[in-house]
């Protein structure tokens, strides 16, 4: 078939727009620093290749880590809604997704108490790391308890589901109020 999806052409332009918008709005050419996840790197490489030819500075990039999906690996994806938390998810849906999330835990509570778990592969632990535990000492302690079998996955899942629902509830309220602005 000799056709292609318009997204192949359109999406790189959308991704590149933040690099050039300042000059378009103000006439001032300033360097751009763009935070993006590693999967966006191909777009920035193309942008860097063409920027100077268009009269702009080459944009710099900062690669950010993904907030992983709730499955056994990879990023959240709208095409896998059961592995993603959406800003408009309702509390019951969030709780169900979190309770079904992949963790670094063992098959049984007894086995996990004996052998510990692996927070490095745990999607729930990543929520503490990225969003819900600002105190490094507390995060390190949670990791130690996890690895040592002192803390079970169910405890973390219950806590994260509650924290997410509070966070999302506040977001949804603000979103509704913003509609009136």
Role assignments for model-derived ranges:
Residues 38-181:
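Conserved nucleotide- and phosphate/pyrophosphate-binding catalytic cores
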Residues 1-64:
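Divalent-metal (Mg2+/Mn2+/Ca2+)-assisted nucleotide/phosphate chemistry catalytic cores
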């Amino acid at each position: 078939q000799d056709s292609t999806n318009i997204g192949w052409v359109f999406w790189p332009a959308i991704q590149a727009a933040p690099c050039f918008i300042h000059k378009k709005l103000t006439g001032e050419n300033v360097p751009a620093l763009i935070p993006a996840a590693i999967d966006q790197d191909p777009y920035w490489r193309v942008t860097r290749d063409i920027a100077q030819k268009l009269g702009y500075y080459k944009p710099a990039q900062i690669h950010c880590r993904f907030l992983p999906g709730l499955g056994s690996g990879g990023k959240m994806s709208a095409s896998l809604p059961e592995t993603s938390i959406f800003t408009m998810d309702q509390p019951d849906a969030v709780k169900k997704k979190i309770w079904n999330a992949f963790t670094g835990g063992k098959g049984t509570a007894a086995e996990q108490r004996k052998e510990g778990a692996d927070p490095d592969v745990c999607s729930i632990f990543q929520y503490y790391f990225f969003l819900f535990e600002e105190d490094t000492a507390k995060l390190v302690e949670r990791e130690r308890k996890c690895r040592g079998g002192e803390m079970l996955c169910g405890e973390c899942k219950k806590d994260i589901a509650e924290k997410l629902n509070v966070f999302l509830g506040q977001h949804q309220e603000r979103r509704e109020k913003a509609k009136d602005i």
